[in-house]
Amino acid sequence: MKKKKIGLLVMAYGTPDSLDEVEAYYTHIRHGRKPSEEALQDLIGRYKAIGGISPLAKITKEQAHKLTDSMNNMFTEYEFNCYLGLKHTAPFIEDAVEEMKRDGIEQAISIVLAPHYSTFSIKAYNERAIRLSEEIGGPVIEPIDQWYDEPKFISYWADQIKETFTKIEDNEKAVVIFSAHSLPEKIIAAGDPYVEQLQYTADLIAAAANIQNYTIGWQSAGNTSDSWIGPDVQDLTRDLFEEHRYESFIYCPVGFVAEHLEVLYDNDYECKVVTDELNAAYFRPTMPNAQSTFIDCLATIVSRKMKEIVDKELILNNN
């Protein structure tokens, strides 16, 4: 019996593959407006500081393909085909949807490699994909909107924190800062659940790791005229030190799923500069990347959506 093909659309932010691509990438982020030479060189300098280019592109591809392999192992009666769609670099989200159409994919599941829902991220990704699929007559895309409370995601970070605390002598003088990418404050006024979801993720992880000293912060805010969600993790670090005299800071950027510029520079460089100034210890647990435990987490999320689709089809076929 021929297996039914299912498209697995894995979406992520994207990153330049080389320093030569940084300007085009930055221009795309700015909706077609080229950055100033000063802003461009600042961004290039950040990439150089982490070794020349971000590992994100390689990690994202590995995550997508390993997830697809896991799905094929879990659902042997179906054939999952991997399609990678990126927000700001090729292959763009639209490229992936068009490729699915050319390949004859009639049904697809989409997942964004970001756990927390916001109109700026997950909603925007899925809308781009679904809008084009409707325009070109398929495939039908079943989106996964959020997975910030997935137990295996919570367990991953709780385990990382527990391991980190084994390296700290005085746990009562340590604090965990859970962070995500800052977004414009106007999303809060519009009822976006992004902030509440990060707090809930932090509460779940803290409970699972049995830690008392923790808070949430925001990082990597854009350089625009908008007000962005705060406090920024660097300011937060200084405030926490002044108030509690913490000796160890553990940064958990749970809004991200891989090592990339925002983690390797904004956390590992900029936050460490602050902890060094305060003569405090800096810790940042290992990111999920393409570790088997995290791939299993993603597969659990996608398989739940797949079972919903299968159950829906059974109901329709029995009517």
From Swiss-Prot:
NCBIfam families: hemH (TIGR00109), PRK12435.1 (NF009095). It catalyses: Fe-coproporphyrin III + 2 H(+) = coproporphyrin III + Fe(2+). It comes from the Bacteria. InterPro entries: Ferrochelatase, Ferrochelatase_AS, Ferrochelatase_C, Ferrochelatase_N. GO terms for molecular function: ferrochelatase activity; metal ion binding. Keywords: Cytoplasm, Heme biosynthesis, Iron, Lyase, Metal-binding, Porphyrin biosynthesis. This is Coproporphyrin III ferrochelatase 2. Its EC number is 4.99.1.9. Fe(2+) binds at residues 181, 262. GO terms for biological process: heme biosynthetic process. Pfam families: Ferrochelatase. Belongs to the ferrochelatase family. It comes from Bacillus thuringiensis subsp. konkukian (strain 97-27). Involved in coproporphyrin-dependent heme b biosynthesis. Catalyzes the insertion of ferrous iron into coproporphyrin III to form Fe-coproporphyrin III. Gene3D superfamilies: 3.40.50.1400. It is an enzyme of class 4 (lyase). It is found in: Cytoplasm. The keyword Cell cycle does not apply.
